[in-house]
Regions:
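N-terminal helical capping/dimerization or prosegment-like subdomains
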Residues: 1-78, 240-244, 258-261, 335-346, ...
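Metal-dependent amide/peptide-bond hydrolase catalytic core
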Residues: 5, 47, 168, 177-354
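Active-site beta-loop-alpha junctions enriched in small/polar residues
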Residues: 23, 72-74, 134-136, 162, ...
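Buried hydrophobic packing segments
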Residues: 34, 108-118, 146, 199-202, ...
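Generic recognition of long tandem-repeat/solenoid scaffolds
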Residues: 53-57, 93-98, 272
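Active-site metal-coordination/substrate-binding segment of hydrolases
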Residues: 64-128
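Hydrophobic/aromatic beta-strand patches that form the interior of the parallel beta-sheet core
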Residues: 67-69, 130, 157, 316-318
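Acidic/histidine-rich catalytic neighborhood of metal-dependent amide-processing enzymes
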Residues: 105-175, 179
Length: 354
């Protein structure tokens, strides 16, 4: 394995992808370009569903366990604070600047290069590479759809910026839309029933309640009121007040359990947008985790959401870059981080026994 050549290929591919806008649900052009490189330049037999791409390594055997390599092709929209063109890949010293360079382009190109190295080897497991769309919006046409067309997966390695440290647990997400009901009236008279005051009582509970079961890796469930809206004009007592709750769950609770606790304690009407995005965890004793530890990696719990939330099998999140750079102006990745990722991914996977 020539790490220098693979790193250069990865950098070239990353620069190509940075210059193609690929916000969530608008990844077609980037997927077209990536598929062309994978098929024509790398000789990878590439399948496609929508804007999702995947490859299955030679020698697939249903009797073997299957490991999935995953990264996402979509990006968030650039903020107004960029001082550079977010869609122009700029190399300055060791840094590559551009939208999606850190999240999630570096993981994507590193995993593609490692898959190239491993696809023809006789591995004791099946290897699949999947590049998913719509990760940033947890869309139904990304990983959720991919999992309906891929073979059965036993474990996944999800490439996200973690400094190449293994995240073995990840917080889930549930968003609740809450409506407090009152009765309209004239603000000058002692009439009506102010929905804002009912909402404030419930928001006070949201602010002060602590879920009793905490996680050693992920800490407590985090519940935050983030949006509030009520009223139409200053002299009318509002009959409704809507507010939104953002809940980041740990693995001690299902989203359904948290929803029931909230409903039991709020007087307002509560609706969950979805229960899909669950907290995830892989056992510390899993061979993938143990191999990472043997390579000097330190397991941790991640507060940020990824496509792991849609995976109903064990998964570990590990990739080049730093999560703090994601979704920020002048996002960047270091070329040395990509080189390190290619080497570590290869060492992690080449002699792995599941």
């Amino acid at each position: 394995m020539n790490v220098e050549n693979l790193t250069q290929d990865a950098v070239n591919l990353l620069c190509k992808l940075i210059e193609i806008p690929s916000t969530s649900r608008e990844e077609k052009e980037a997927a077209d370009a990536l598929a062309e490189v994978m098929q024509k330049d790398y000789g990878l037999k590439t399948e496609r569903e929508g804007n999702n791409l995947w490859c299955i390594a030679d020698g697939y055997d249903e009797a073997k366990k299957t490991l999935l390599l995953n990264a996402h092709i979509d990006t968030v929209k650039p903020t107004s604070l960029w001082t550079r063109d977010p869609h122009k890949a700029t190399i300055e010293g060791d840094c590559i600047y551009g939208l999606g360079s850190n999240d999630d382009g570096a993981s994507l190109v590193s995993l593609v290069e490692v898959f190239r190295c491993l696809k023809d080897k006789e591995l004791p497991y099946n290897l699949i590479l999947a590049i998913s769309a719509e990760e940033e919006v947890s869309g139904k046409n990304g990983m959720e759809h991919l999992l309906t067309v891929l073979p059965k997966i036993d474990v996944a390695l999800v490439g996200e910026p973690t400094g190449m440290q293994p995240a073995i647990a990840e917080k889930g997400l549930m968003v609740l839309d809450v409506t407090a009901h009152g009765k309209a009236g004239h603000a000058a008279r002692d009439e009506g029933d102010n929905a804002i005051y009912h909402a404030l009582d419930d928001i006070a509970w949201v602010r002060n309640y602590r879920f009793p079961k905490e996680s050693g890796l992920l800490g407590p469930v985090k519940m935050t009121a983030t949006i509030i809206n009520a009223g139409t004009q200053h002299n009318v007592i509002p009959s409704e007040c809507q507010f939104t709750i953002d809940i980041r769950s740990n693995e001690q609770y299902s989203n359904e359990e948290i929803y029931e606790i909230v409903c039991q304690n709020l007087k307002s009407e509560v609706k969950a947008r979805s229960f899909r995005l669950s907290s995830s965890r892989i056992d510390m004793g899993h061979p993938l985790v143990q191999k990472a530890i043997s390579l000097g990696r330190t397991p941790f719990g991640s507060p940020t959401l990824s496509d792991q939330a849609l995976m109903r099998f064990p998964s570990m999140k590990m990739g080049p870059g730093n999560s703090s750079r994601s979704h920020t102006a002048d996002e960047f990745i270091k070329i040395s981080e990509i080189s390190e990722a290619i080497q570590l991914y290869y060492e992690l996977l080449k002699d792995l026994f599941l």
